[in-house]
Amino acid sequence: MKKILIPALTAALLCSSAFALETSVAPKVTDIKNHSPKTGLIVGNSYSFYNCGVHSYLRGLTRENKQDWKARIITISSGCLSYHDVEQYMGPHEMDPYAKKDEKGNLINPMFDVVILQGMSTEPIAEKSIPTFKKFLKQHVATIKAKGAEPIVVDTWARQNKPEDTKKLADAIITAANENDAIVLPVGLAFAE
């Protein structure tokens, strides 16, 4: 799995403009502002956690690039974006090791440089959950930006028995991210390759 995921994440991070050719929707945001983030929060579900967790692979990539990086992962099994309290996650909290302080010792934002948001695998395309997905993606992206961090929305991969959902997921997630001026990490498209 590691041999597949590291190249996929690397390709997704470096070649995000390439996925416009494979979807009906072109991404509005094609680059992150902070090219050297030092802290990250990953908000997701079991897709984010299992197989050593996305945070472990990102840590491996950043170590290979000799880049300082620490990440926190908060996942809920089968969790939709609406299950997460991103406002609370963004702190800062007094005893939190990720909390940043100014020269006087006061807690400051952002606690994280980037926040990676991953919805449940069918959430962006299941008719019943689309409105909630869009509502909470908008709310979470606004919260992340207000706290001084940069949101990154994951284009999740289709379930193994539904490969035809790859394009549907990409189109739905890119559309929702575009509506909120957020970049998409095209992991689902990279896995499909």
Regions found by a protein language model. Name each.
Residues 1-2, 146:
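Generic cytosolic/nucleocytoplasmic N-terminal low-complexity/intrinsically disordered segments
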Residues 2-67:
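N-terminal secretory targeting modules
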Residues 4-6, 10, 23, 30, ...:
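Residue-identity detector for threonine
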Residues 5, 11-14, 43, 57, ...:
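Aromatic-enriched hydrophobic runs in primary sequence
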Residues 19, 61-63, 68, 130, ...:
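Alpha-helix boundary/interfacial micro-motifs
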Residues 39, 48-129:
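Conserved SGNH/GDSL esterase-like catalytic core that processes O-acyl groups on lipids
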Residues 100-193:
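Alpha-helical cap/lid subdomain in secreted, periplasmic
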